[in-house]
């Protein structure tokens, strides 16, 4: 049985708003039918967020498609933010790496940003994977239906904000904005938001967000976990510290697995409201203790050519760092450098955050203090940087499990990273 469309939706499909709009609607209908959706529902958030922010030369079909939309006047019904820019002159790169970036990889960046502006880009600073930060301003309300695609933003919006969004693909995201509807299935439905895993946290200390997220993602894959025992370490209020933790935790669940929604007992909105009623019948159980986290960490392959190479670069901020993280890390780096008797970090280190967050950070005394330590701040996407084959060959370290998963970067915990960048690359 096919999808049941309203008269308005059927009219768009039949060409009432032109051939291009009909194609967009047909694409969404086919997408929905592939997942057995019975109907389309309105997109209700104020803004959208697009995953495709990078002007790779090989993405010509994307530019052709976007141009067709622009020419037909099929612009987004919502303004939107987009994932981070791939390039920043502040980030260290040698002449050859720069040549590859500008001439061979992201040689359509300016052209593509021009297309995004015509389609409905919020503003020139709206490039970040953490669009939900209050400084950026694209923060959906609980229950709103979204057409987002960036996996770390989708899982945050679903879990921490209680919005409703599937893990859409790039381009499919803007199509939902253009017609104003998305297929109703999966994480948009009450049933699809029920947990099929109970994850019990039995660690002796607060688990590393990126490591815990990785463990859960690899175990449950695309299922919904209900996490018990984490409120012992995070509390029961979604304050800045808890939201920052869940940002990094969620990104790891979404990239090391394919999690689009998690519930944290006594903390996230739906878990607070419904409790264990969110757990589906027959849910499986996964217990995480210190030994399990260590097992997961030890399982990561080291893909450097030379395992013992001295790191040449450190990236922090995948997803982009919060204002709270930038401040906390300024204190931590300063203190560790003082203990080591140094004034500057001994590995080139880049902290990445949203342009709007960096603007706020620059207004605080912390910005000058961080600059003194030699740490560089940037709005770049570290993943886009690492996709340059010449950069991928370098020994790069990170505390991001997402960056580890998608690139050659090597994962260390926050504490281990701090030792490496302040004490000369020594292991923690």
Q: What is each stretch, according to the model?
A:
Residues 1-315, 319-428:
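Non-transmembrane, aqueous-exposed alpha-helical and coiled segments at domain scale
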